[in-house]
Amino acid sequence: MADTSADTANALSAADRPEDDGWRQTHLGRLLGHSMRRFDERVLELMAHSPHAPLALANLAARAQVSAAHVHITRHLSLRGSRLVDLAHSAGMSKQAMGDLVGQCEAWGLVTRADDPRDGRARLVRFTPVGLDWLRAFRDAVAHAEAEFRAEVGIDVATVLMLGLEAYAGPTASA
């Protein structure tokens, strides 16, 4: 006879059965994920209303056409340009997914692809002048969202949290 979930639950000793599963809602990973989504949403909201963001891109952000995935390019693309595979790796995405994202950003005029002068077989993804304007508006939106965060939780908590996250993320966080 096959075990049912009720049989399995009954077979667990009292010590093995969590009496309170609230920990699943409040563990560090889940809180970090929710916090990151909230922060990214606020940055995109600020970008949508930024006088410094290129108008067409601000309109896309205002209509929720720009997502946190698009922010990956803004966060990870080197000012000197990046190979697609390196960009995907630093953003924690597959090369194919990053390729699709770069294609969309290229259509919006944020980035362009150019031959890599160090390797004729490779191509670099680079910011366009419009993309650099977007990057500056992104920098301003991040600074504004960070200031809001400090105001909400307090400067001391924000500082300790930032230092703790930098230590926890390790050296790859600033790479």
Identify the residue ranges that each predicted region occupies:
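Carboxylate-rich helix-loop segments that flank metal/cofactor sites and access channels
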Residues: 69, 101-104
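Non-catalytic interaction surface on structured domains
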Residues: 28, 39, 91, 113, ...
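N-terminal helix-turn-helix DNA-binding core of bacterial DNA-binding proteins
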Residues: 43-94, 170
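Alpha-helical linker/hinge and terminal dimerization helices associated
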Residues: 32-35, 39-50, 91, 134-152, ...
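Charged, amphipathic alpha-helical coiled-coil/dimerization segments
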Residues: 103-162
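N-terminal leader segment of winged-helix/HTH proteins
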Residues: 1-65
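Active-site phosphate/pyrophosphate-handling residues
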Residues: 27, 72, 133
